[in-house]
Amino acid sequence: MSKITVILEKINQAKPLDFGTIFSDSIELFKKTWLQGFLLQIFTIIIMMPLIIVIYVPLIGIMLAQSEKGYPDPNPFANFFAGMSIFYILFIIVAVFALSTISFVLNAGFFRIMKKLDFNEEVSSSDFFYFFKSHYFNKTFMLMLATVGIAIVAVLLCYVPIFYALVPLSFINMIFAFNPDLSTSDIVKASFKLGNKKWLLAFGLIIISSLLAQIVGMIMCFVGVLFTAAFVYHPTYLIYKEVIGFEEENPVEVIE
């Protein structure tokens, strides 16, 4: 049997999972991964910084010029947007896709780190960059295109389908992280199969974990969001672990 057939069969035969158990296990796992989750946010901010500078620095310059005049003037903004060339817009679009692909790869590395910490294995910061290899970038770029395409179609269908698509899309990166040898279409297929099977459970956990991460982060003077933001990945990781599992178990330590 092919690998994708085995994965789909595991999803079909998946046992019921308990919301409370997954949520409490997510909190326990987060206690092991919070530092790596913080590093993930820092790396993501660093990667996105060039795009932020390109987009916002001109706007900041316009606002500073307005402050010198002492009164609001909409003309500079209108002139700025009117003067944006098609090449500049295309550059922004390409940059967004390129940087989003890099962010996607970083997240895949974080999922591998999460698994290692879950099984009490040693990790290092270099594990974030495990997928920073040329033969992975083409696939991750195609997965990004597929994700964006599905999201756009869902939004065009009066927004309601985006709530359905949210769950399957949240599994795409994870299935890639643990099955990078699968084709793009097989990864998307497995993600939607798993998302459909555990939709209500996963949707509830994603919403609750997102709210909890934001509330706790704001209580910690907003900077805490950098530490808590990655918590949202833990419930979906545990669903994947319980339904599909991993090819190799926690290695047994050999004492010489």
Where are the regions that the model predicts?
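Interfacial aromatic "cap" segments that immediately flank transmembrane helices
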Residues: 16-47, 122-153, 169-217, 255-256
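Juxtamembrane/interface motifs at transmembrane-helix termini
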Residues: 57-62, 159-162, 206-210, 222-226
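Selective recognition of hydrophobic, aromatic-rich stretches within alpha-helical transmembrane segments
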Residues: 2-10, 85-119, 151-186, 217-248
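Short, charged juxtamembrane terminal tails flanking transmembrane helices
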Residues: 246-256
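Short, small/hydrophobic-residue-rich motifs at membrane-helix boundaries and re-entrant hairpins
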Residues: 2-4, 10-119
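Short acidic/polar alpha-helix capping motifs at helix-coil junctions
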Residues: 75-80, 90-94, 136-139, 152-156, ...
